[in-house]
Amino acid sequence: MKHLLTVIFCMIVYITQINARLTFQTFDVKSGISDNYVIAMLRDQYGFMWFATLNGLNRYDGYQCKQYWVTDSDTYSNCFNNISEDASGTIWVRTPDQYFYYNRELDKLESNIEKRLRPLGINDKIEMIHVDYEQNLWCMTGNKLYYYDFQDKKLQELSFPDKELSHIVSRQSYSCLLFSNGEIAEVDWETKTVRKIVQLELPRSGEHRIYMDTQFRLWIYTIYTSNLQCYDIQNRKMFEFSGKETIQSDIVKAIIDDGNGNIWIGTNSKGIYILNEQADNLMHIHRDSGTPFSLSSNHINSFYKDNQDILWVGTTKQGVAFTDLNNTAFEICKTPEQEDISCFQEDRNGKLWLGFDGKGLACYDSKQINYKLFNTHNSNIPSNLIIGSYLCLLYTSDAADDGE
């Protein structure tokens, strides 16, 4: 009994520490996005955040949101179900009816996806597009599968069984297909074959999804059902995980691996469960109106982890919640000039630029721990009085500098 109480106490302390460590901020319609029902998210190679919602696609530049629609009359067609970016920088989005790509030059969504696919050697009418973890492109048409490797600039294709394909997942050397009948097959591009590895029993109705974590385990779930199963590819067996009954007491909507040994499982109404492999236990994160910076909603739609270790949570009612997985509260950057900082901006390389009220412009590189000051004496900036910045544009003043 004493041992049991000790275990329970340790679990409570661990869960409390996790909840205390994670602080969430919220981005919603009040912040500028078109709808609080957020279905998918993306941070592109330029640092813009994209939010696919029930009513419109949104791009956030750090200051404001811009909305994109494909029609002015049909709300259904403006529901964006998915968004991804391949290694070439092409952003692909999907509505209930069709696929679009984002034309950066014209700043609009284009429906003629053939324009981007033909140069890759893909000429068929495409029914499904998938971008994998290495940002390579997968396309499906009929019972034919295309795979384009951007690094090798190589297109491969193969035929798969005449079955309804529900989802594609690929990470490093493992590529798997989930069919609507519950069959999971592995793709071998060397032999150009598709071989069955396991047969699962799935609900007859609903959208079947598959997710591959960093340990190459497949998490299979069906939207709007409590069904959740896990299959270990490397060991070729089903994986039993802690808290399965607790998780399946609600509808599973999204799954993600945070890269730190935790599997995040988003539910329809009970918030987020975090399965920690090392501690072999289940943690629960939920909305707490009495706690500052808690999760904004228990109704989870989607997850997305960007390259800055920010985890984004799409909800059905409260927009987007996001948290820093590294829990870096503050980092001190000393400024020897000891002058008022009038503005600051982060560039696409992660460097922080500081504008001073009379001492010029400084650049701080947190990765290299390097600090450099630019002024009228050692650079070509027109003034030491920096009054603002916006979208990489610098604003100065010709007024007399107080510090000079």
Regions found by a protein language model. Give the residues of each.
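Carboxylate-rich, polar loop motifs that coordinate divalent cations or form catalytic acidic clusters
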Residues: 1-398, 404
